[in-house]
């Protein structure tokens, strides 16, 4: 009895948000932007022992192919315009991970030439603290970003994925 299903179990029903978010969170392509010692730990995370490929994460060298940027290390005021330009070249939706104490809060460098946290210039989605953080910490941060992406609401009216995240004041 009940409604007959002519196609049987060959159809999966899901919301469009859930489907798009699943695709995005299981295929993050981060732009590598290593500025100091944290970059070594980021490279170790991509190596065989930790293997980011199993999470669908493939490092990209071009911002036009990336949907995430990992700021790893000390951000100087001279480097900040370059980071902003790279961020602007990334297609939407895009996410930012601040890796290491220097990227999160300036670290031990409380000086005029160091930006005291990349969140002064870019909207940071995940902070990975440590000096430098271990590869396991970056993996945990990436998994937190995947959780965040999975819960996002998409606006499919004008363009896919232009969320309601607040941008920092210029």
UniProtKB/Swiss-Prot annotation:
Its EC number is 7.1.1.-. It is found in: Cell inner membrane. It is a peripheral membrane protein. One of its GO terms (biological process) is electron transport coupled proton transport. SUPFAM superfamilies: HydA/Nqo6-like. It comes from the Bacteria. Its main location: membrane. Binds 1 [4Fe-4S] cluster. NCBIfam families: nuoB_fam (TIGR01957), PRK06411.1 (NF005012). Belongs to the complex I 20 kDa subunit family. NDH-1 shuttles electrons from NADH, via FMN and iron-sulfur (Fe-S) centers, to quinones in the respiratory chain. The immediate electron acceptor for the enzyme in this species is believed to be ubiquinone. Couples the redox reaction to proton translocation (for every two electrons transferred, four hydrogen ions are translocated across the cytoplasmic membrane), and thus conserves the redox energy in a proton gradient. PANTHER family: NADH DEHYDROGENASE, NADH DEHYDROGENASE [UBIQUINONE] IRON-SULFUR PROTEIN 7, MITOCHONDRIAL. This is NADH-quinone oxidoreductase subunit B.
